[in-house]
């Protein structure tokens, strides 16, 4: 099993989980194709993390890309940046800029 992570990504976890669903339980090649045609920002971020996990597998254990599949995709909630928006009569409303931690684990088929 080979893991790659990206932390503090400025994508809402709810939207990143939609993109993560495109690659669950697929071979690595299929997952890359799915993410490359996705127009979501989270899809681009997940593709970079997936490429990192594939590079870890190829460089550390000399495993071919065709034999790899996505074992686990995890999208966790990161810290939130808090901003304020001006409202009427001197009031204000909170704005939460959400972040995500992305984790992709790949391994050989049958693990």
Curated annotation (Swiss-Prot):
Any one GO MF annotation of this record: rRNA binding
One cellular component term from this protein's GO annotations in UniProt: cytosolic large ribosomal subunit
A Gene Ontology BP annotation from the UniProt entry: translation
Homology family: Belongs to the universal ribosomal protein uL22 family.
Described purpose of this protein according to its UniProt entry: This protein binds specifically to 23S rRNA; its binding is stimulated by other ribosomal proteins, e.g. L4, L17, and L20. It is important during the early stages of 50S assembly. It makes multiple contacts with different domains of the 23S rRNA in the assembled 50S subunit and ribosome. The globular domain of the protein is located near the polypeptide exit tunnel on the outside of the subunit, while an extended beta-hairpin is found that lines the wall of the exit tunnel in the center of the 70S ribosome.
Subunit structure: Part of the 50S ribosomal subunit.
NCBIfam families: rplV_bact
Protein name per UniProt: Large ribosomal subunit protein uL22
